[in-house]
């Protein structure tokens, strides 16, 4: 039996569920959640995601929190191990210091042994340099590698 992949859902993915300005990406994102509902994947977010969502306009907060509840996304907590690993990503120049939350997303997924980070952030996360650097750092520190993909690369249909 094939192991169900464990996905870390980044804040950008939750925002794209409601992104009327990019209907193609919105539909791909909704398809991903359909596959999550069908239990093709285990799906997780973190308290960092919740904190980022809380900075959105009130209506968007309600929509996203409702979506999180509807799809039963498990919330992982940032801990000292994840903070330390995130700092290593920043020290290595993989993530700019002003984007600590992005480093935390990767670190939380890594320390919780998830398989894939699903994210729409092409600016500095879904990039070859970042993927290679993160996995090099992870291996050097005794963690397993992690995949970083957009929803378009994850959906099966």
Question: Which ranges hold each PLM region?
Answer:
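Short, C-terminally biased terminal segments at protein or domain edges
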Residues: 142-157
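An acidic/histidine-cluster motif and surrounding catalytic segment
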Residues: 66-67, 140
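Active-site neighborhoods of divalent-metal-dependent phosphate/nucleic-acid chemistry enzymes
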Residues: 74-132, 155
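Short, well-structured N-terminal submotif of metal-dependent ribonuclease cores
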Residues: 1-45, 54-66, 91-97, 131-134, ...
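A structural signal for short, well-ordered beta-strand segments and their strand-loop junctions
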Residues: 8-9, 44-46, 117-119, 150
């Amino acid at each position: 039996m094939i192991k169900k992949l464990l996905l870390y859902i980044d804040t950008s993915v939750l925002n794209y569920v409601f992104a009327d300005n990019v209907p193609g990406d919105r539909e791909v994102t909704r398809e991903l959640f359909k596959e999550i509902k069908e239990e093709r994947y285990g799906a997780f977010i973190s308290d960092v995601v919740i904190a980022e969502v809380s900075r959105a306009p009130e209506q968007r907060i309600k929509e996203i929190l409702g979506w999180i509840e509807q799809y039963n996304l498990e919330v992982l907590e940032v801990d000292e191990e994840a903070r330390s690993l995130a700092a290593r990503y920043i020290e290595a120049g993989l993530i700019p210091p002003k984007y600590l939350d992005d480093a935390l997303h990767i670190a939380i997924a890594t320390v919780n042994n998830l398989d894939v980070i699903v994210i729409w952030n092409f600016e500095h996360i879904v990039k070859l340099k970042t993927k290679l650097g993160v996995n090099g750092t992870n291996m050097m520190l005794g963690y397993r590698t992690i995949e970083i993909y957009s929803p378009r690369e994850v959906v099966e249909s």
